[in-house]
Amino acid sequence: MMRKFLIFLGFVFGFTGLALAGGHLENEKTPEKFLQYYFDAFNAQDAKKLDTVFAKPFQRIRNGETISYTSWREYINFEVVKKTGWKRSVINETEIVYDSDKTAVVRILFSRLDASDNIVAKAEAAMIIVKPGSQWKLATILLPESIPVSEEDS
């Protein structure tokens, strides 16, 4: 009887752990769900979730120049982003240009909004995402110069 109770508790705690993982499982679904997971993590400035988003190394292409980063922390500087009046970003449109089991190329239109939900910037970007294991990762982003993210942009 005690053994059955312990097995039951194991299942309860196991499923509770999965439920608490929440959006983490979004990394394992479609490219679109992964991108929403990334935007949610970015908007929340959630370092733990952002750690799960980026491939290592990660590359950015801007104005014909390719820059490699060993961590998203080298790439994203939220103080630079906030100087534009940014409060959050929203996805306006996505188009899957290429999709396979382990790689996708996505064209995305997005907006940066201020605290009153006014658009402070709007841009088109291209992202290459890869799935080296069970989770999608952002491997490369092509982002216009008009969207500051890093120290290099300020």
Spans of features found by a protein language model:
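Short solvent-exposed beta->alpha transition segments
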Residues: 32, 51-88
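A mature extracytoplasmic/lumenal domain signature
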Residues: 54, 64-65, 108-112, 125-127, ...
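Beta-strand elements of well-folded, non-transmembrane domains
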Residues: 43, 112-114, 129-131
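Positively charged n-region of N-terminal signal peptides that target proteins for export
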Residues: 1-5
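Short beta-strand edge/turn micro-motifs at domain boundaries
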Residues: 122-153
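Surface-exposed, charged secondary-structure patches
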Residues: 74-118
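Bacterial N-terminal signal peptides
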Residues: 7-17
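Short, low-complexity N-terminal intrinsically disordered segments enriched in polar/charged residues
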Residues: 16-48, 52, 56-57
